[in-house]
């Protein structure tokens, strides 16, 4: 990271000291400190040298750091973005490749030529989901931004992961896009591997006060409800589920002085084609 390209470990020794700890002695050879020289581009037709240089953000005279160079050109897919690979992949270039090549080393300076293979723009082909046992496929598929026929974009993958995790009934850490590119056809298949989690919520509190009697609150919320499966007892676990609907019921009592009942049902995709939330509720206070 500090420009010591030829740094090398010559020897290492581990010694048990008198205190029962381990002392580690490492003998290093730093070598010369190197700096970036001229950086040129080859194979870029979509973006100009000036645009790529701006994103690369490495100037002549900066300390040599191969890890930084590989990260800036996007040798591997980055979730954070801001690198050259992300620039291409957000415009459909799934098959983009970048290969930084040393073309000259003189004194303490290294010149690079960054060779790009842009490839064709890819489109989504087969999009599937797996791992969902209760949740219907369509409930997950309607949330996806990776729509068959559309141009591939890295940002679609990232936003879909984030939005699926916000549903509440999928484990955010187990949402994995399994990407299968087909370079010959210029397409990409994606299987969204998911794992469900319990999303139901229970609220319970109770107390007793002199003069007012028993007080308390009981509330339940089901976040992956299915109203159309109410009549199908075989689907109850413990209630009908799988359509991504939300049902909430809450009872609150303050002894004889106050009682309230609240019930609500929410359909997040009324009509099924656009995200259009519909909620109906009932409330009664005595």
Which ranges hold each PLM region?
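Gram-negative/organellar outer-membrane beta-barrel architecture
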Residues: 10, 46-51, 153-286
């Amino acid at each position: 990271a500090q420009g010591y390209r030829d740094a090398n470990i010559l020897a290492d020794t581990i010694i048990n000291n008198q205190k029962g700890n381990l002392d580690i002695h490492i003998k290093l050879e730093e070598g010369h400190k190197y700096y970036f020289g001229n950086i040129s581009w080859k194979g870029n037709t979509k973006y100009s040298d000036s645009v790529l240089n701006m994103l690369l953000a490495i100037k002549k005279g900066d300390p040599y750091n191969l890890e930084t160079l590989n990260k800036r050109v996007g040798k591997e897919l980055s979730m954070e973005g801001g690198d050259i690979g992300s620039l291409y992949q957000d415009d459909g270039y799934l098959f983009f490749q970048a290969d930084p090549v040393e073309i000259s080393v003189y004194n303490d300076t290294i010149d690079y030529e960054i060779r790009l293979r842009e490839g064709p723009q890819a489109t989504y082909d087969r999009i599937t989901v797996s791992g969902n046992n209760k949740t219907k496929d369509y409930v997950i598929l309607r949330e996806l931004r990776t729509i068959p026929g559309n141009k591939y974009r890295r940002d679609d993958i990232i936003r879909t992961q984030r939005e699926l995790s916000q549903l509440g009934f999928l484990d955010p850490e187990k949402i994995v896009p399994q990407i299968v590119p087909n370079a010959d056809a210029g397409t990409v298949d994606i299987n969204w591997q998911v794992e469900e989690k319990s999303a139901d919520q229970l609220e319970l509190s109770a107390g007793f006060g002199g003069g007012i009697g028993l007080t308390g609150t009981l509330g339940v919320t089901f976040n992956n409800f299915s109203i159309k499966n109410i009549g199908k007892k075989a689907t109850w676990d413990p209630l009908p589920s799988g359509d991504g609907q939300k049902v909430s019921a809450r009872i609150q009592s303050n002894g004889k002085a106050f009682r309230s009942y609240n019930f609500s049902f929410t359909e997040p995709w009324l009509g099924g084609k656009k995200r259009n939330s519909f909620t109906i509720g009932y409330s009664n206070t005595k």
